[in-house]
Amino acid sequence: MAFSIKMRASKGDKHISGAETIVMEKENIENITAGYIKRALEHELGAPDFINIKIDKINKKDIIYIDALPIKTINCKNKEDARRVAKNLLKNEGISDKLIEKSFKIIDDGGMRGAPILNLNGERLEPDKERGVRVKNISTTEELKEKILKNNIGTDRTVDAIAIASKVINLGVIAELCTSDNNSYTTGYVATKNGYFRITNLKQENENGGRVFFVKNDTNIEDLIYKLENKPYIIK
């Protein structure tokens, strides 16, 4: 058996921190959970008043292994330049200007615990509009993490995000737009079938963050949400 470890921390209704991984040996559970608790308690958004650790058994045969999306960093001098880059990447996937503007407004308004799912008509498909949808049961291999960090391809946040992005694109999501909910981290990304594009200055310091998923109009939304939340993926 393998084990899925998830951490969520909050203060009142405000999300503070979240992390998760999949471990193959139960001996690793204690160190991982201790690290997650430390991460939550020392978060820049403030000390949480609630930390939840959840550990679930997973059958190793149910885990899907996929390659990470190729990572490319696009350096932008300011938010306006960065958003123009993001917009062009999304337009290349058939997403309209109007829908892109709507997605940025959702992100900039903040406050969501998960991500909204928008079809190409601009309709929100997730059943709980306040909660959104969370991508769960994901992890990266140590080899991928080491490659990203040692080669200066990205940061620890990149390691976390590449797992989400690679899984959602593998499940048929057209694109993902994301900025961090950490106040000081201004690099965001667009993920498509063509790669994971890190974009510097996609938001300014102390602005809200969030993510949006774009899907085809004929997407089976119940099936997609089930797989996003429950199907275990390890990204290599």
Curated annotation (Swiss-Prot):
InterPro entries from the entry?
Answer: BioW (IPR005499)
What's a Gene Ontology MF term here?
A: 6-carboxyhexanoate-CoA ligase activity
Which co-factors does it depend on? Mg(2+)
Principal EC category:
ligase
The pathway noted for it is:
Metabolic intermediate metabolism; pimeloyl-CoA biosynthesis; pimeloyl-CoA from pimelate: step 1/1
Enzyme Commission number: 6.2.1.14
Catalytic activity reported: heptanedioate + ATP + CoA = 6-carboxyhexanoyl-CoA + AMP + diphosphate
Kindly state a single biological-process term from the GO annotations of this entry. Answer: biotin biosynthetic process
Q: Which UniProt keywords apply?
A: ATP-binding, Biotin biosynthesis, Ligase, Magnesium, Nucleotide-binding
Instruction: Report which residue ranges the record marks as coiled coil.
Output: none
The leader peptide range reads none
The subunit structure is:
Homodimer.
**What family does the Swiss-Prot or TrEMBL record give for this protein?**
Belongs to the BioW family.
Q: What does this protein do?
A: Catalyzes the transformation of pimelate into pimeloyl-CoA with concomitant hydrolysis of ATP to AMP.
| Protein name as catalogued | 6-carboxyhexanoate--CoA ligase
Q: What is the source species?
A: Methanococcus aeolicus (strain ATCC BAA-1280 / DSM 17508 / OCM 812 / Nankai-3)
- Whichever gene encodes this chain, its name is bioW
